[in-house]
Amino acid sequence: MKKNFLLAFATIFLLTSCGNDDNENNQNAIKPIVGTWKMSKIMMISGSNNAILRSSPVSGCEALNTFEFGQNQSFSIKYYTKNNMECIADGFDTGTYQYSENSKMLTFTYSDSMVESSVVHSLNSIEMMTVDHIEDYNDDGVNDTSVILFKKQQ
């Protein structure tokens, strides 16, 4: 589950600051990500020939997973799983995030000190799309592209 989360968000933000002006700019840069998000669509695209290997809406218990980003650069993820025909909470992750508007890198530092990054392809006040190349989905020896579309919850 962390993989899907990072795929989607690693592309978003890596906040660094060198002075007061940079800090102000960083605070403005993270505002679109602040809030609660849910995955709405996942696509896998072949790294060999750009064919779409999978394109599907997020459904079932996975559609209930929430990704919350705070203004203080904290994040929390709540996961759900199916148990006896109903979705139940199945754990959570917390930590801090940083975003670089220039590189579009979103870096997560989990509370267990694990660090992961993802690339944010696009971000506005209602949608975020992350792109990553970390796995060989179709076992052809070439890493494929994972694209995850998130919708901001109101």
Language-model features: locations:
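Positively charged n-region of N-terminal signal peptides that target proteins for export
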Residues: 1-4, 19
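C-terminal motif of bacterial Sec signal peptides marking the signal peptidase cleavage site
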Residues: 14-17
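Sec-dependent signal peptide hydrophobic core
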Residues: 5-10
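Lipid interaction determinants
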Residues: 19-94, 100-154
